Design a protein with these regions (language model features):
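Long, basic N-terminal domains or extensions that often function
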Residues: 1-283, 288
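Function-dense linear segments that define catalytic or interfacial modules
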Residues: 279, 286-314
């Protein structure tokens, strides 16, 4: 049993596309593997704005063998009056790959027919995945797709890398002008170079080391901690907003929060208007004081750390 890992490295995908795309990718991949008689465990998904990934553990190295019964010519055509196989029976046996002596006669609704039991040996899983993975990628639905570089393929955003591993082996295939391999990009600003992934088990750890938190739960938790830390530093507390946390986590690869201020005269504007403006238009978190009143500041989430964070938001 091996672990399968597929990562599609892209330009920045809209935050709202990511969740549905991951659901589709994982469901489609598991169905295609089941249909191909590849035993497998559960799927786990990963993502950032610049990548969509799915991991499947306990993947068999070969297809499950399949035994099927194939009907041939009618008995009277396949065997002569003495019960010996005719040319028709011999050709049927040759066609399905069995010995003439292995042929049987079966009663059917249409009469008695020559039949053969044929056992299909399982193909290597890597061979099957060379066909399956491109189908999964191109079959991923998005509200809008785009073409690029005059290629006859579409995706949410241009594809730059494809990481495809079964255990420590690459699953080789091409999609447009991109070949699969064992490389993924680090953080766009803090580590823009490619990194080598030797095995799926190293994926999360290696990307974390290049400032990419690909685990959705880990990145969400960091967003919450960063927002809480920044709001405390500003002298207040963040206005709870789980939905905004989910949105923001898909806007960044390595969340770093900063507090900004606005003119306190804007607090004369109805609370709901201020919150909506910050939340919907800027994806900012509102900050409240101990009495629950809005403070003239907000928390913004950055995708990189600067030398002087005070210059980022004022």
């Amino acid at each position: 049993m091996e672990t399968l890992l597929l990562e599609i490295g892209t330009e920045e995908i809209p935050a709202g596309y990511i969740g549905p795309a991951l659901d589709s990718m994982s469901a489609t991949l598991l169905k295609k593997m089941t249909d191909a008689r590849i035993e497998h465990g559960r799927a786990r998904v990963f993502a950032t704005p610049r990548r969509l990934a799915v991991e499947v553990k306990k993947v068999a190295n070969k297809q499950t063998p399949l035994t099927s019964e194939i009907l041939g010519p009618p008995e009277k055509v396949g065997f002569d009056k003495a019960g010996k196989p005719t040319v028709a029976a011999k050709k049927f046996a040759e066609k399905v790959g069995v010995s003439v002596n292995a042929l049987k006669v079966k009663d059917t609704d249409k009469g008695r027919y020559v039949c053969a039991k044929v056992k299909e040996r399982g193909l290597p899983t890597r061979t099957l995945l060379k066909r399956i993975l491109p189908e999964v990628i191109l079959g991923t639905p998005f509200p809008k797709t785009m073409k690029w570089a005059e290629l006859d393929i579409e995706f949410a955003r241009p594809i730059h890398t494809i990481l495809a591993l079964l255990g420590d082996k690459v699953i080789p295939f091409s999609l447009g002008d991109t070949k699969s391999g064992r490389y993924a990009f680090g953080h766009y600003f803090m580590h823009p170079k490619k990194v080598k992934i030797s095995h799926p088990k190293d994926y999360i750890k290696i990307l974390r080391s290049v400032k990419v938190l690909v685990d959705l739960a880990e990145r969400r938790k960091r967003v919450e901690k960063e927002v809480e830390k920044a709001s405390k530093k500003a002298g207040g507390a963040v206005l709870p907003d789980d939905e905004l946390v989910d949105i923001v986590k898909n806007l960044v690869e390595y969340p770093i929060a900063t507090a900004g201020k606005f003119d306190k005269n804007f607090l004369d504007v109805p609370r709901e208007v201020l919150i909506t403006a910050m939340r919907e238009h800027q994806k900012y978190f509102a900050v409240i004081d101990k009495k629950g009143k809005l403070m003239p500041c907000f928390i913004a989430m950055n995708n990189t750390r600067t030398r002087d964070m005070n210059l980022v938001a004022t």
